[in-house]
């Protein structure tokens, strides 16, 4: 299944990189690459792996080694990555 990252999800990755990069640019790169890798590896082969999402019609993949959740929506031909949220942030009402 093809993964498609929304503009908001890409902005989330950029914000994560900028925040972590203030202290350690190499760590920022590792975290962002790990998030992308986890999404592509886990979701492309098994889109139902995530739990039902808090927003209707979405699912959430909890990233085990990192404090992030990837919100996504399964479409007919692809999987849409909606957001990449830190677990301590308030969850949006809509995606």
Task: Show the residue positions of the predicted features.
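A short catalytic or substrate-binding loop motif that flags glycine-/basic-rich loops and adjacent residues
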Residues: 62-65
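Basic, Lys/Arg-enriched alpha-helical interface segments
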Residues: 2-58, 94
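Short, exposed beta-strand "edge-strand" segments with a Pro/Gly-rich flavor and a Y/T-containing core
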Residues: 1-5, 86-89
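Enriched for short, Lys/Arg-rich terminal
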Residues: 68-95
